[in-house]
């Protein structure tokens, strides 16, 4: 019996809302008695879901728990200039410049100036090449779980990590925009993917 379901989603609105952990459990066909909850911890949400449930298993509170994260970027209400609650800003409960991991990464570059964009880009290209080689050498496949995914054209089985970009080059990295700051360091190429 599954004891709990923890699911992270950064923007808990629409079909990512409604306590996504509980909703996921019900839609997966788990018994109504299985609870579920949502975590919103920005980019670290899924990792928090895994560590929280693993800790509960470790202390004996759970025997079995499910953990994960969902982000459906097409469902995010972007472009509406939706600011945080003004009270948060006036009472300094939230730093508006620290609301996402992209700005956090830029601040790391500020703190460690030796971590240049060129070094970050080179690391990212190397990481992509290592991932592609590991996949080619069948080292990743044992850890991959096929997932059924629906689309407008029907259902298909996703069996491969879609985030690997073995064709990445340092030259290509130079052309990527820095969305968090003008002349920043962080791009879609050297940041952690969604």
Each model region followed by its residue ranges:
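Helix N-cap / loop-to-helix initiation motif
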Residues: 1-3, 115-116
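Short beta-strand segments at enzyme active-site cores
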Residues: 3-6, 67, 141-144
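Conserved catalytic cysteine-centered active-site region
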Residues: 5, 9-63, 96-103, 167-193
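Glycine-rich nucleotide phosphate-binding loop and flanking beta-alpha elements
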Residues: 13, 72-74, 131, 193-194
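Short, well-ordered secondary-structure micro-motifs
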Residues: 17-18, 76-78, 157-161
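Active-site-proximal alpha-helical scaffold in enzymes
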Residues: 39-70, 109, 113-139
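Flexible glycine-/small-residue-enriched beta->alpha junction loops
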Residues: 54, 58-111
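N-terminal extracellular/periplasmic Venus flytrap/periplasmic-binding protein-like
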Residues: 119-194
């Amino acid at each position: 019996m599954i004891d709990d379901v923890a699911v992270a989603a950064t923007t808990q609105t629409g079909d990512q809302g409604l306590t996504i952990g509980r909703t996921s459990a019900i839609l997966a066909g788990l018994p109504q008695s299985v609870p579920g909850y949502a975590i919103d911890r920005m980019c670290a949400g899924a990792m928090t879901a895994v560590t929280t449930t693993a800790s509960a298993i470790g202390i004996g509170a759970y025997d079995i728990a499910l953990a994960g994260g969902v982000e459906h970027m097409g469902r995010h209400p972007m472009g509406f200039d939706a600011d945080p609650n003004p009270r948060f800003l006036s009472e300094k409960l939230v730093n508006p410049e620290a609301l996402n991991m992209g700005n956090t990464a830029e601040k790391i570059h500020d703190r460690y100036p030796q971590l240049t964009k060129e070094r970050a880009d080179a690391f990212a290209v190397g990481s992509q090449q290592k991932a592609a080689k590991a996949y080619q050498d069948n080292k990743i496949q044992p850890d991959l779980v096929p997932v059924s995914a629906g689309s407008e054209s029907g259902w298909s089985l996703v069996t491969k990590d879609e985030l690997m970009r073995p064709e990445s080059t340092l030259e290509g990295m130079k052309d990527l925009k820095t969305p968090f700051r003008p002349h920043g360091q962080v791009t879609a190429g050297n940041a952690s993917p969604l």
